[in-house]
Amino acid sequence: MAIGIGVNTWVWESPFTAASVGLIAKAQAMGFDAVTIPVEEPAAIDARAVAGALRDTGLRVHVTGAFGPTRDLTHDESRFREESLAYLADTLVLCEAWGARLLVGPCYSAVGKRRHVPPEQREREWERAVRGLRRAGAMAADHGVTLAVEPLNRFETDLVNTAAQLVRLLRDVAHPAVKAHLDTFHMNIEEKDVAAAVELAGTELVYVDASESDRGTPGSGQVDWAGLARGLRAIGYGGDCVIESFTPACRTIAAAAAIWRPLAPSQDALAQDGLRFLRRLLA
């Protein structure tokens, strides 16, 4: 099956606002098949303008969530778990309005939550994530959307770091609208064998982030890209592979992703060179 190549607008800007809509046409002009729109604050986005730009370009669209301290399905306080679900509900409305079939990201917990905790607490938090994702999956299904759940590296979460942990989580959730999302940046840190990790996710895998070992241009660093391609071919993956990177010019997201310097001659160069590399890799 043909694999499409997409780009996340985080490459250029954060947050995505009414002023960011032109990035959709930019992605099309560069030759991408799909665009991923981060919804950091749903109210900041001109939903109609986005829908119009998507209609005009014909690009496939995905949506990624942003999960800060108050958007945490594992939190001890139920009000924060409910806040996370309320945010997902608002974001799912946008997904449906735009025709996005996937809402992707680490939606089980707050990014940056990493601690040594007793096994009993870890298990409680795991069960909260399972219950929360079941509820979120039901909400997503009502909008014709699938949640694609992403493991993060050990420096960004203490709950789900590997494909094996993700597969266990999906089995526990056991909801048809909750599937797998893998990111090469995190895999490069946590997986011993990229191809094997992809194969373990198997047909549950519906979304892939292409991000270099330093978050720079795909193909310029240490990620096992050949292993990724082998794994995707082995499972017959037919979804999109989406370039994800960040710019140090956007201080909030740069601080969250620890981006302290430029990672390419320009963000446009990162996108264009990454697109060429991925076209060759996944042809």
Model-derived segments and spans:
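Active-site-adjacent beta->alpha loops and helix N-cap segments on the catalytic face
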Residues: 43-53
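Active-site-proximal loop/turn and secondary-structure-junction residues that shape catalytic pockets
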Residues: 11-13, 39-41, 67-69, 109-111, ...
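Short, well-ordered coil/turn segments that N-cap beta-strands
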Residues: 1-5, 31-34, 55-62, 97-102, ...
